[in-house]
């Protein structure tokens, strides 16, 4: 895992990986099921990530790693943590298990507060390895790993480790701060969780708010009934013309023997739904079982 995914001194912002992030959430639902996702309803506790003032470094690292393993529901996995000089924050050896070796940078000997963030990413790698869930491209796999950590309750630590000011530039993981906020907000909406009070980094909280605003927009896209006026007007024009909307539109019209259909992604899991174009309708997503109010 890298400490800073961008050029030295520069941290990337915005939502450049959003398509892969959304695909990652869909992949998690398909692999774990809606009930399997809801098992991860409790985020990693701040107390489990903290080091006591007199706590031994190695014992504390193994305590945090063990708590991370429990949080990600890996009951038979064991994570062994070792420190060494390295440029990356951490790396994991993905063997057949049940024992996995994680190497972390020596800088965590003094910056212990961020050790749990580094372990969150690496233990998420272990979970995905166990699930046999991966994307073809290495870069996309790293996005999948960060998304998995955030969506299943441990990755908020990666965002909280983000620092950016005149003297400090620090970011763990491969998602931008805003993308971490986006994933955490989608998790929060699903499970009724609000992490606002957990962030110790003001910049992390600001990124979380920006990500949450972007996640909220997913629930206001046509043909969802909650779409705003401008969005509804654009949808109505495209529906009358029978044309595929421009780039950036989530919905697509399809001709079918029984009439026209509109397809669009579920705002919760990303699975595409196909509904008849006929006005107000209530639909249940077959993957996450969310009931959606729509106006097609």
Task: Kindly give the residue locations of the regions a language model identified.
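Post-HExxH zinc-binding segment in Zn-dependent metallohydrolases
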Residues: 138-173
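Auxiliary, metal-adjacent structural segments of Zn-dependent hydrolase domains
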Residues: 33-97, 107-112
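N-terminal, Lys/Arg- and Ser/Thr-rich interaction peptides
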Residues: 16-44
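A short, surface-exposed helix-loop junction/capping segment
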Residues: 41-52, 127-128, 245-251
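Pan-zinc metallopeptidase signature
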Residues: 2-19, 23, 171-296
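Active-site recognition of the HExxH zinc-binding catalytic motif
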Residues: 116-133
């Amino acid at each position: 895992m890298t400490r800073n995914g961008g050029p030295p001194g520069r941290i990337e912002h915005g939502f450049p990986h959003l398509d892969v992030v959304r695909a990652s959430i869909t992949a998690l639902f398909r692999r774990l099921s809606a009930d399997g996702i809801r098992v991860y309803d409790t985020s990693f506790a701040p107390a489990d990530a903290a080091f006591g003032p007199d706590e031994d470094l190695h014992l504390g690292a193994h305590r945090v790693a063990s708590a991370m393993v429990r949080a990600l529901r890996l009951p038979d996995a064991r994570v062994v943590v070792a420190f060494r000089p390295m440029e990356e924050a951490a790396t994991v050896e993905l063997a057949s298990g049940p024992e996995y070796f994680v190497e972390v940078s020596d800088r965590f000997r003094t910056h212990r507060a961020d050790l749990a963030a580094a372990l969150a990413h690496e233990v998420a790698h272990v979970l995905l390895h166990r699930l046999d869930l991966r994307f073809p491209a290495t870069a996309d796999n790293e996005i999948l790993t960060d998304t998995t950590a955030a969506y299943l309750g441990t990755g908020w630590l990666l965002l909280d480790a983000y620092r950016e000011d005149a003297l400090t530039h620090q970011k763990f993981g491969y998602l931008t701060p805003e993308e971490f906020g986006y994933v955490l907000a989608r998790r929060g909406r699903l499970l009724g969780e609000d992490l606002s009070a957990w962030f110790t980094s003001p910049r992390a909280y600001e990124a979380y708010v920006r990500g949450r605003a972007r996640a909220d927009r997913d629930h206001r896209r046509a043909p969802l009934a909650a779409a705003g006026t401008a969005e509804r007007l654009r949808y109505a024009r495209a529906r009358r013309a029978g044309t595929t909307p421009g780039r950036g539109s989530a919905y697509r019209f399809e001709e079918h023997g029984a009439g026209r259909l509109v397809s669009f992604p579920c705002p919760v899991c990303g699975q595409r739904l196909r509904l008849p174009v006929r006005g107000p309708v209530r639909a249940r997503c077959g993957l996450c079982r969310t009931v959606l109010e729509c106006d097609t």
